[in-house]
Amino acid sequence: MKEIMEEYSNTFFACVQEWPDEIKSDIYKLYAYLRVVDEMVEGIDSEKDIKEWRIVIEQFHQVSDKYQFEGEWLEDFHHAMFTDLHKKKHTMVSMLEYCKGSSESVGCMMARILGCPPEADYYARALGRAYQIINFVRDYEEDIGKGYEYIGKNHNIYIRLFRENLEEGMKGLHYIPEELRGPILKANKSYIQVAEDSG
């Protein structure tokens, strides 16, 4: 699971290493599942993939039960992933709707793993949305090469939107236990640098 997250989200992977082993393990399982669903949309390559995916899915369900993830989060995430099967070019409205599942729901799951109360969900969604938007900016050329256009060519609009959502999300930082805030702050710093390099 650790290896999958390192490959799938190396920026965030580097940041989470400060967290306790139990939290890291659960986050690895979460991100492995996110990757599996993404790969399912792209297609199954082999019987080996199916066996590996089954293990990932089983471990994710253990994490989901442990933290009582809401069914709506999973539905929104799956909906966003399967949107990629038929929608290749997004407007601002459809991109933000995509973020609802691809990143906002993941933000809520992360918040539960970190021990945050439901009151933190609004801020977790804003932070997840911010991260997704700046990832779209960073990966623009790669996504275009795959036939996807999540954002328009004027990246300054999306960089501003990233900053606005990051600021809003950070208003809920106090919901995260103080000893667990470091990796979030480190991730923010990394993504802010991406924004500065892209602006």
Each language-model region and where it sits:
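Catalytic cores of Mg2+-dependent Asp-rich isoprenoid enzymes
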Residues: 1-131, 137-199
